[in-house]
């Protein structure tokens, strides 16, 4: 069913945009993904990004790409868009610790990664920059430091206001890298950490 839908969408997109260069407002992950999908279907694209470079508004913060949100594994899902996931620097997370105020930490494990940890930003090891490089190699055109024209075909400029604010901390330790999920009012009122 998924393959039929994907094939239908590819045909629909190819028919609609075959005669022009598709204009995309926003060079975040959504804009890059839209451009790569179209470009891999032989549809020319141009991305308008108001920042001077891709990932410029992020600063090396970490994000988890959940493996369970895709119909197939994350590698296949990225391939369907046109990206090569094996060229993206990431750390598969197969286990993590869950903390509550009433129990000892519980270790959760799985053979298949729960998610892949990636850094965000404009450095060479950040996912934003790595997706940008793959888009450039595929022929996506970029216009930096200018607002998108009002007649863009795809709007991928993100939200106007953050839906959550996250505070992080970096510190040196002799321990191996690890992931901890903190639940409950004591650790994270109205959310999780």
Regions found by a protein language model. Give the residues of each.
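Short beta-strand to alpha-helix junction loop
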Residues: 69-72, 110-133
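Short, well-ordered alpha-helices that flank and scaffold nucleotide-derived cofactor binding pockets
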Residues: 36, 40, 133
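Hydrophobic anchor at the start of a short beta-strand
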Residues: 22, 43-45, 153, 179
């Amino acid at each position: 069913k998924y393959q039929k839908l994907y094939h239908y969408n590819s045909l629909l997109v190819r028919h609609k945009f075959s005669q022009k260069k598709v204009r995309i407002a926003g060079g975040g992950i959504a804009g890059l993904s839209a451009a790569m999908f179209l470009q891999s279907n032989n549809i020319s694209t141009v991305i308008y990004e108001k920042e001077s470079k891709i990932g410029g508004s992020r600063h090396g913060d970490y994000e988890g790409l959940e493996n369970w949100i895709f119909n197939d594994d994350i590698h296949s899902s990225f391939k369907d868009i046109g990206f090569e996931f094996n060229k993206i620097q990431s750390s598969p997370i197969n286990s993590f610790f869950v903390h509550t105020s009433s129990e000892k930490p519980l270790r959760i494990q799985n053979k298949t990664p729960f998610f892949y940890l990636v850094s965000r930003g404009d450095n060479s090891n950040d996912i934003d920059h790595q997706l940008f490089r793959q888009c450039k190699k595929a022929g996506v055109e970029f216009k930096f430091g200018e607002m998108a024209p009002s007649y863009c075909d795809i709007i991928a400029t993100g939200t106007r206001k953050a839906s959550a604010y996250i505070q992080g901390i970096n510190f040196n330790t002799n321990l191996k890298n690890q992931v901890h999920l903190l639940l409950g009012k004591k650790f994270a009122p109205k959310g999780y950490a």
